[in-house]
Amino acid sequence: MNMTRAAEFTAELIRTTSRGLAGLSTARLFEKIDGAETRYGEGGFDSWRQALSARLEALASALEADDTKLFADDMVWFRAVITSREIDAKDVGLALESMRETLTAQLPGTTDGSIDRFFDAAVKALAEPAT
């Protein structure tokens, strides 16, 4: 394992605060989607918060393993799940953007770009057509 102390700290911080970070990320996401409350209904916010909490856990695991593909693959899998429920795949990209913005704003040590390569890998993977 090639994890640096900074990556180890960031992964632990994400795990410890994933529920709160997921809530903030979901709030950002809902600001980006016109009519999100109507589209996703009464339990929509909580469903997205739970889903983004799981994505943040995947990011923490990817950080610990120093494996960008691990996070990218999780986001591609998530897109498959979301689109199977007839939800626009674009919302997954917006969710990824919202998580990145939230982590950069909320976590110490992430403004140096240390998590960017994980998000960049996920963006690249999501740009590929779904199979």
Features from the language model and the residues they span:
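Core of compact, soluble alpha-helical bundle domains
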Residues: M1-G93, E97, T102-T131
